[in-house]
Amino acid sequence: SGEGTIIINSGIAAGFPSPADDFKQNRISLDNELVKNKEATFFARVSGQSMIGAGLDDNDLLVIDRSIEPQNNKIAVCFIDGEFTVKRLLIKKGKLWLQPENSEFKAIEVTNENEFVIWGIVTNVIKKV
């Protein structure tokens, strides 16, 4: 399950302390660090460049929590007209907009004509470096 302790098995020094003692550490669980509600959390990969201004790059792994109440200015994964998208939720003058974080993309106004569901709120992003 990825939990436990890292043990460096270098024997017990009878003289000077082992240099490996400086590197002993507890193993962390990414589930414990990143997932607050296991039953409502899922992961998805970013595809595209529309959210680069928010630090979400192509192929990043998003941690998404469906139990968090959507709010103005939160980044959400939404299903609109048959497609998934990740955008910032903006409420302006009583209207809901899906705002990209890249000036090359236009905001999407959500209207009654759209098939629309907010799937969840992005809580974390996992990146490769």
Predicted segment positions?
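Low-complexity, intrinsically disordered Gly/Pro/Thr-rich segments
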Residues: 101-112
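Short acidic low-complexity segments
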Residues: 64-71
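Short, positionally conserved secondary-structure boundary motifs
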Residues: 1-52, 84, 91-95, 106, ...
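A short glycine-leucine-enriched loop at secondary-structure breakpoints
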Residues: 53-57
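Short, compositionally biased
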Residues: 72-86, 90-96
